[in-house]
Amino acid sequence: MFAARVGRSAPSIGFVRRLTCLTGIGNPEPQYANTRHNAGLVMLDLLRQRLDSGGSHSYKVCMNAPAKYCHVSPDLLLIRSDGDYINLSGKTVVPLWKRLPHRDAVTHIVVHDELSLPLGKVQLRKPGTSLRGHNGLRSLRSHWGSDGFHRLAIGIGRPHERDPQVVSDYVLSRFDGQEMSILATQSLEKALEKLQSLL
């Protein structure tokens, strides 16, 4: 169903429509909803609300993967990887990427949390740049066979201590109301600004 739906978006013979695929990665929800590690999913939902102003396009469940997808337009596909752990993102997402028609005409942008950026900051990095130790991005690279995807890094800040357990507890903690408000305003506006050249 996923491939067929995407296929219907492709125009007729002689012209290949370019597709932008925004993929948000995170841990299973609702268990980890609104945690810092799921900032990529939070931002994907905010982007969908803004880009689909009429609210007429909702997520559909993938039949063969723990993920959801949404066609905001014939040129823009959103994939929400929310059914398996973020460190296994490649296992979930890449089979869906491989089912897209005209793969060479697809621009992939992965939306993810970023410890090295403070909350409210967003960075768009080109394919081939550092993965900065993000295990979800590493998994995508491993399963895709390359790092040929853009990364939209959503800042979540970093705890003062660098102890691995402290960092783990931090990324699995939930955003409070004020932090969610920052994501929905400052972070969202910066994300839209960064994505202008690709959407």
Spans of model-derived segments:
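Universal eukaryotic N-terminal targeting presequences
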Residues: M1-F2
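Nucleotide and nucleotide-moiety/phosphate-recognizing core
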Residues: R5-L131, R138, S142-S146, H150, ...
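Acyl/amide activation-and-transfer machinery of modular secondary-metabolite enzymes
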Residues: Q165-R174
